[in-house]
Amino acid sequence: MPRPSPQQLEQLEGLRAVVLAEMMTLGLLKEGDHERLHHVPLGVLRSNATQRHGVTRWSGDGHGNLKVDVVDLNPHLLTGTWHDYAAFVLFHEYLHVLGHRAHDQTFRALESRWPNARASARGKAFTHARRLARASWHWVCPTCEERYPRQRKGSGRYMCRRCKTVLKDVPSRDIE
């Protein structure tokens, strides 16, 4: 796993402070939780990650108990454009650290308490931005002009989700 740069560590610590303060305000932290979350190591994912925005990594102690190793965030979340969404992703991962491992109804109810609804809804936009940044090809529908950014050629094997027309491969450098 990549190690965060000193600048990334500084940004992660700033995010931690923001998220922990908000969790205190929301009344989500029991006694000892603040200290526990404050000591969870923070890191970054590989820079080529497009689907994963954050992850809580666990290890077993040999007795069936789990211990948090690290909470990793996508390094592209640490840019100014995505700061609000980065705080939400860290909040999401902290809910996992507090014992809510599944994305069940209880987890979603806790997650919905994050005060910035706009930030929490930016996940699809972040994934799309990362896919665009990494795309070498666009699969383009000649009928409806829908575009699908991809890293590999489709070679005529895929159809448009909208109109079921075979998609054409267009190099990213040819896309305006």
Residue ranges of predicted features:
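Active-site-proximal or metal-binding-adjacent scaffold patches in catalytic folds
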Residues: M1-F88, V97-E176
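Walker B catalytic acidic pair
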Residues: E93
